[in-house]
């Protein structure tokens, strides 16, 4: 997501159309109806679903969270404008891998250019009171991430390659 228009699209897509007199009308909802399955999954009536199936923080009762990813220099350059002009963004998640690649330092998360870019994203988010997300929180960096002010934390799933390793061994490709 690199500009105002591309960032407004997911918010519009998550919202049902509302009367123009409704509070927080913009961005206008583009979502189709069909609430039956979703209401059943949520364990609520259709009318309750309509009330809850809106974007937080636009609708304080909304239970949908729109997270945009900031993973290239162009996005950083436009981030302040995006956060000023696009209501409803709940979190800005830094795409560390793609960002480091875009800067020319693939997976070198400690490179000064990558650190500087991530700091700029956090600062802009803080200025606009939008939580900034860190995608790679682990025991060794948890305290640093919290101290730096990240408010949305993600951890990688535990992965096991036992079957792959066994197959490689069986095929002599270890």
What is each PLM-predicted segment?
Residues 2-9:
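Short, small-residue-biased leader/transition segments that mark boundaries at the very start
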Residues 1, 134-135:
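Short beta-strand
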Residues 12-107, 127-129, 136-140, 152-160, ...:
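Conserved alpha/beta-domain cores
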Residues 109-118:
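Charged helix-capping and loop-helix junction motifs
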Residues 126, 146:
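Anion (oxyanion) recognition and catalysis
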Residues 10, 121:
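Aromatic/hydrophobic pocket-lining residues that form π-stacking "cages" and hydrophobic walls in ligand
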Residues 149:
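Conserved functional loop/turn residues at catalytic and ligand-binding sites
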Residues 122, 142:
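Short glycine-/small-residue-rich flexible loop motifs, especially phosphate/cofactor-binding loops
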């Amino acid at each position: 997501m690199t500009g105002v228009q591309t960032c407004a699209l997911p918010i519009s897509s998550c919202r049902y159309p509302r009367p123009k007199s409704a509070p927080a009308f913009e961005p206008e909802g583009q979502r189709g109806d069909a609430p039956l399955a979703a209401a059943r999954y949520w364990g609520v009536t259709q009318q309750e679903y309509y009330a809850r199936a809106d974007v937080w923080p636009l609708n304080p009762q909304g239970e949908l969270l729109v997270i945009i990813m900031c993973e290239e220099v162009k996005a950083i350059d436009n981030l302040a404008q995006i956060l000023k002009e696009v209501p409803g963004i709940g979190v800005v998640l830094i795409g560390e891998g793609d960002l480091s690649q875009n800067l020319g330092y693939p997976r070198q998360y400690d490179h000064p250019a990558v650190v500087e870019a991530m700091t700029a994203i956090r600062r802009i988010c803080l200025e606009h009171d939008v939580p900034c997300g860190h995608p790679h929180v682990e025991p060794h960096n948890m305290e640093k991430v919290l101290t730096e002010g990240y408010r949305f934390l993600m951890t990688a799933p535990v992965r096991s390659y036992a079957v792959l390793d066994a197959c490689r061994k069986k095929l002599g490709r270890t």
